[in-house]
A protein has these predicted regions:
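Switch/connector loops and helix/strand junctions flanking conserved nucleotide-binding motifs
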Residues: 10-12, 70-75, 124-125, 140-145, ...
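Short, well-ordered loop/turn and helix-capping segments at boundaries between secondary-structure elements
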Residues: 19, 23, 135, 149-156
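A short beta-strand element within the Helicase C-terminal
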Residues: 114-116, 120-137, 142-145, 160-164
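Conserved segment of the helicase C-terminal RecA-like domain
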Residues: 106-110, 143-166
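Short beta->alpha junction loops/turns
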Residues: 6-7, 67-68, 136-139, 165
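Catalytic micro-motifs at enzyme active sites that drive phosphoryl/nucleotidyl and oxygen chemistry
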Residues: 50, 119, 150-151
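Conserved C-terminal RecA-like helicase domain
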Residues: 1-113
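Short, surface-exposed helix-loop/turn micro-motifs enriched in polar/charged residues
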Residues: 1, 53, 124, 135, ...
Length: 166
């Protein structure tokens, strides 16, 4: 989970993260093919790499933010890192059509990373959440609630990690 300063930052981070994620998948695919053909590594290591690559391909991302009147027009005034206008429609549609909160709580669901600005920071318990990225100034109760997200106990979870960019 990543906590961003505002809705537009969430949308920009989504674009950046998913773009980099896809590049990482392509790089791992290339490396795996090279190792299978050229280097003929240990089959167990190759199997682990195949599993990791499959997990990367299955992992889904979502932006979860509160809706506002005239948000489509407001968001479109800003550009992403490549210069294209930001678009909240695909994210809003996803939030309306699916129960993203339930999906994210299910550790077997491919929804593995959400980007939020205020939603889900208080009163939202995801025991399996292991890493929280904070890119937003927070204090008092909101900060404690956010930190608590990564500190829940869950089967197979050894620790929680908090990365604060502020």
């Amino acid at each position: 989970m990543m906590v961003c300063l505002d809705r537009n930052t969430c949308l920009k981070m989504y674009e950046l993260i998913t773009e980099k994620w896809q590049l990482a998948i392509e790089l791992q695919e290339k490396e795996l093919v090279e190792e299978e053909i050229i280097h003929c590594h240990d089959p167990d290591i190759l199997d682990e790499k195949r599993k990791h690559l499959a997990w990367m391909k299955e992992t889904k991302f979502a932006v979860v933010v509160s809706s506002e009147q005239s948000e489509i027009e407001e968001v479109a005034k800003f550009n992403d890192h490549s210069g294209k206008p930001l678009d909240i429609l695909k994210h809003r549609k996803l939030m309306q059509e699916r129960k993203l909160d339930e999906e994210f709580k299910d550790s077997n669901n491919p929804l593995g990373f959400v980007i939020v600005c205020a939603m889900w920071l208080t009163g939202f318990d995801v025991k399996s959440l292991s890493t929280l990225y904070i890119d937003k100034p927070m204090q008092n109760h909101t900060l404690m609630q956010a930190i608590a997200r990564a500190n829940r106990v869950a089967p197979g979870k050894k620790q929680g990690t908090i990365i604060d960019y502020n």
